[in-house]
From Swiss-Prot:
GO terms for biological process: fatty acid beta-oxidation. Keywords: Fatty acid metabolism, Isomerase, Lipid degradation, Lipid metabolism, Lyase, Multifunctional enzyme, NAD, Oxidoreductase. The gene is fadB. GO terms for molecular function: 3-hydroxybutyryl-CoA epimerase activity; delta(3)-delta(2)-enoyl-CoA isomerase activity; enoyl-CoA hydratase activity; long-chain-3-hydroxyacyl-CoA dehydrogenase activity; NAD+ binding. It comes from Aeromonas hydrophila subsp. hydrophila (strain ATCC 7966 / DSM 30187 / BCRC 13018 / CCUG 14551 / JCM 1027 / KCTC 2358 / NCIMB 9240 / NCTC 8049). This is Fatty acid oxidation complex subunit alpha. Pathway: Lipid metabolism; fatty acid beta-oxidation. The record marks 119, 139 as: Important for catalytic activity. The keyword Transmembrane helix does not apply.
Length: 715
């Protein structure tokens, strides 16, 4: 044994060839501070080995290295700049030391080698992968960029154009795709990885493979003429500007970093990379995106805990109500290996539901994500039926019929009498209180809400709603089922609108008030999209959701919270609803809709909307972007804070994930609580106080005011 640490070991395999094996306690290898320290000690030990002829890096896990330890990031980002630079320098000295060993080096890769894991394999002379390997540099998705030499070595291995695509998109690549661009040198079957790695390093030792030439190219400036460099970096910058936009600086900083370091040797280039990394690490965007990742991990941990505590796992499910939503839920369940019965009273609805599942599977097939066999397996795992016979023995029933309390109550009561006594019932409702639907049930403890978002296959959030009598066992089983479906379940307590819709409608009330005060709805949309960062502004979102749906939900919210959400006369939403302008579904809402070349609805301005709104609005007035953002966001933020104070949602982390995953809250802002921490509670309270005369939705809670006075934060 040359070296033994807690997360890695080094020992000889045969004839002077050493193996450095990453094998941390736990399920995955990460490049945390402890592992980097061990790696430094291991390389120092190898430098003293006179018998050393070659080195192979391997993993004792299913994945090579999944990346750095992101739980350490926020603490690192808060370090003084000089300390952060020192940490980066120490880490990069380790990878440079691997690259400078006087013997050939090789990485034998299985599973994921991402982020720091990818940068580790780039430090070796050769990269051999098995068919399970996936490699990539996802750092820009976290608001940062590679900091362990990724922007230096990858362009010199696969060329600037390919490297810029890898780094700026943050995608991971399968072994065969990585082989095509030269990121890895060969792909073998998993059972051949070890023997092939030993043979390859032996060939390098014997001089059959030019490891020194490869190494020299990696440490030299990029081989690009001035014209090639100009074309490469200008094209990349243009594409990044169009895709990432102004709110996400990491991809553009990465492009500028690779460009600035193109003519430099390795050590000079690493210094440039470190400056780019530090610049990004100090941004609010990086903290927000890392925060989302950590919150997501928190949600996953809660779901794992629920699955362990549940007395029974879900092996069979049923969906009541087919159509697009029911078909989407059944597809999601079946595609993740949980067969689903899809029950409806209407043959056409069943056909529509199966059609939705088939369409989604065809999309997967066309993209090469599944093959025909997998498609057949998923479709055969969905059983469409007009009868309850196949529903009797399922573990979970998801009711997804029309959003009408009487219809839902009747269907729930009917199916409760058919299923087993320990089976769980869940209602996919967006507004109807769970405790109300539970009143007619014999086993209300086995009932909860399970609110999916549309389209089901794309929206990661599922709200799990706990009614007054819902048992912990029911919550645990439904949370575990949602997670098994590949969703992010957030448990909320019952109230009108639950969490997501409850906080969305104050935002729409803010919109109604702005339009009534003379704002142009299209100008409001533009500010909320381009400046604040929502995927859709409020008018466009209402058109997409359906103004009839929004109108109904708004009435429900007004009844549920009359002191804050009751209407003051006719609103912009009322006006559109009264003349049957329901949005995209019938071609006219706030905007008119035409079909684009792909047959998808495209919004266009419609003068008729302004004529219809004129009677309820003051004369046209221009509001600056700060006023629009404040008037739109304060009602939502205040309601989110109230939901936390009332225990509707348990933690800031769960609230922020629900907002990002369920509403499309701008990820670069991290969610309402991260946003409040970023701007400062004192500043927020002062801003909200300026608008307090607009009504109760604009008035901050006493508790928030107290937190602001004490200088507290949510995270």
């Amino acid at each position: 044994m040359i070296y033994q640490g807690e997360t890695l070991t080094v020992s000889y395999l045969e004839d002077g060839i050493a193996e450095l094996r990453f094998d941390a306690p736990g399920s995955v290898n990460k490049l945390d501070r402890a592992t980097l320290l061990s790696l430094s000690e291991a390389i120092a030990a190898l430098q003293q080995e006179r018998e050393l002829k070659g080195l192979i890096l391997t993993s004792g896990k299913d994945a090579f290295i999944v990346g750095a330890d992101i739980t350490e990031f926020l603490e690192l980002f808060d370090l003084p700049q000089a300390d952060l630079l020192g940490w980066l320098k120490k880490a990069n000295d380790i990878f440079s030391a691997i690259e400078d060993l006087p013997v050939p080096t090789l990485s034998a890769i299985k599973g994921h080698a991402l982020g720091g894991g990818c940068e580790t394999i780039l430090s070796t002379d050769f990269r051999l992968a098995d068919t399970s390997a996936k490699i990539g540099l996802p750092e820009t998705k976290l608001g940062i960029m590679p900091g362990f030499g990724g922007t230096v070595r990858l362009p010199r291995v696969i060329g600037a154009d390919n490297a810029l695509e890898w780094i700026t998109t943050g995608k991971d690549y399968r072994a065969d795709d990585a082989l095509k661009v030269g990121a890895i040198d060969a792909v073998v079957a998993p059972d051949a990885l070890q023997s092939a790695a030993v043979q390859m390093i032996k060939d390098a030792v014997k001089g059959k493979l030019d490891w020194q030439g490869r190494r020299a190219a990696k440490k030299a400036p990029l081989r690009l003429s001035k014209l090639e460099a100009m074309m490469s970096f200008t094209t990349a910058a243009g594409m990044v500007a169009a895709v990432a936009g102004k709110h996400y600086p990491a991809p553009m900083t990465a492009v500028k970093t690779v460009e600035a370091a193109a003519g430099m040797s390795r050590d000079e280039a690493l210094a440039v990379e470190a400056q780019g990394f530090i610049k990004l690490a100090k941004t609010d965007v990086a903290k927000a995106l890392v925060g989302i990742f950590l919150n997501d991990q928190h949600i996953k941990a809660l779901a794992k805990k629920a699955a362990k505590q549940a007395a029974k796992a879900t092996s069979h499910a049923a969906v009541l109500g087919a159509g697009i939503m029911g078909g989407g839920i059944a597809y999601q369940s079946a595609s993740k290996g949980i067969p689903a019965v899809m029950k409806d009273i209407n043959e056409k609805a069943l056909a529509l539901g199966m059609g939705e599942a088939t369409k989604l599977l065809n999309g997967q097939l066309e993209k090469g994500r599944i093959d025909g066999i997998k498609m057949g397996q998923v479709l055969s795992a969905i059983t469409p039926t007009l009868s309850y016979d196949n529903v009797k023995h399922v573990d979970v029933v998801v009711e997804a019929v029309v959003e009408n309390p009487k219809v839902k109550a009747a269907v729930l009561g009917e199916v409760e009498g058919i299923i087993g006594e320990d089976a769980v019932l869940a209602s996919n409702t967006s507004t109807i209180p769970i405790s109300l639907l539970a009143k007619e049930l014999k086993r209300p403890q086995n009932f909860c809400g399970m609110h999916f978002f549309n389209p089901v296959h794309r929206m990661p959030l599922v709200e799990i709603i706990r009614g007054e009598q819902t048992s912990d066992e029911t919550i645990n089983r439904v949370v575990a089922y949602a997670a098994a479906m590949g969703k992010s379940p957030v448990v909320v307590n019952d109230c009108p609108g639950f969490f997501v819709n409850r906080v969305l409608f104050p935002y729409f009330f803010g919109f109604n008030k702005l339009v009534a005060d003379g704002a142009d709805f299209a100008a409001v949309d533009k500010v909320m999209e381009k400046e604040f960062g929502w995927p859709m502004g409020p008018a466009y979102l209402l058109d997409v959701v359906g103004i009839d749906t929004g109108h109904h939900a708004g009435d429900v919210m007004a009844q549920g919270f009359p002191a804050r959400m009751s209407k003051e006369g006719r609103t912009a939403i009322d006006v559109m609803y009264e003349v049957n302008r329901f949005g995209q579904k019938n071609g006219k809402g706030f905007y008119a809709y035409e079909q684009d070349k792909k047959g998808k609805p495209k919004k266009v301005a419609d003068a008729a909307s302004y004529e219809l709104l004129a009677p309820i609005a003051k004369p046209k007035q221009d509001f600056d972007k700060d006023a629009i953002i404040a008037r739109m966001m304060i009602p939502m933020i205040n309601e989110v804070v109230l939901c936390l104070e009332e225990g509707i949602v348990a933690t800031p982390a769960e609230a922020d994930i629900a907002l990002v995953y369920g509403l499309g809250f701008p990820p670069f802002r991290g969610g309402v609580f991260r946003y409040l921490d970023t701007i400062g509670l004192d500043r927020y309270v002062a801003m909200a106080d300026q608008y307090a005369d607009l009504g109760p939705l604009y008035r901050v809670s006493d508790k928030l005011r107290e937190m602001a006075a004490q200088g507290k934060t949510f995270y």
